[in-house]
Amino acid sequence: MRKQILLSLFLGIIFSFSVFAQGVKAEKIILPGGELNNLYKIDSGVYRSEQPSHAAFKALEEYGIGEVLNLRNRHSDDDEAAGTNVKLHRVKMKAHSVNEEQLIRALRIIKNRKTPIVIHCHHGSDRTGAVCAFYRIVYQNVSKEDAIREMTEGGFGFHRIYRNLIRKIKEADIEQVRKKVMADEEP
């Protein structure tokens, strides 16, 4: 009996460490109608996805999403969101040249949201991945390594050509980013 208890405790500890070692993992969300293939929940009220279609905007609104942050440089969500009450935000980014100011603006929008929000770019992988990695680090105190691992290996379709995003995370002074995000003035 005692051996069984000790074995159970040992296995429980090992399992806990293995889960902890896996780091962070976003929760896959499937909307009715399957409108989005790359939709994940990263925190309470914070989601990430690829570019939503008009039908996806309606499905997101029905799901309870009230705000959308578009990271695309040359595409607004005006047409896709037409006929919904979803509040649109936009921080124009190019995946090959994301800068700290853009990241801070995006993080402030997420911080100041009034309803659940979806963050997206075209595929929901690179620009969205960088913003979500910074979100994890700044707001959830996730390590840079775990945030990078989730961005690159989390099943979101990260494109290795954008290794600059990994460098951006590794080289970021997170305390300075955090201070700027929490400040009221523009970066």
Give, region by region, the residue ranges found by the protein language model.
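Ser/Thr-glycine-rich phosphate-binding loops at phosphate-binding pockets of nucleotides
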Residues: T128
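Short cysteine clusters
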Residues: C121
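Bacterial N-terminal signal peptides that target proteins for export
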Residues: M1-L9
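Bacterial N-terminal signal peptides
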Residues: S8-S18
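Cys-dependent protein tyrosine phosphatase-like superfamily
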Residues: F17-I117, V131-P187
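Substrate/cofactor-recognition hotspot
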Residues: G124
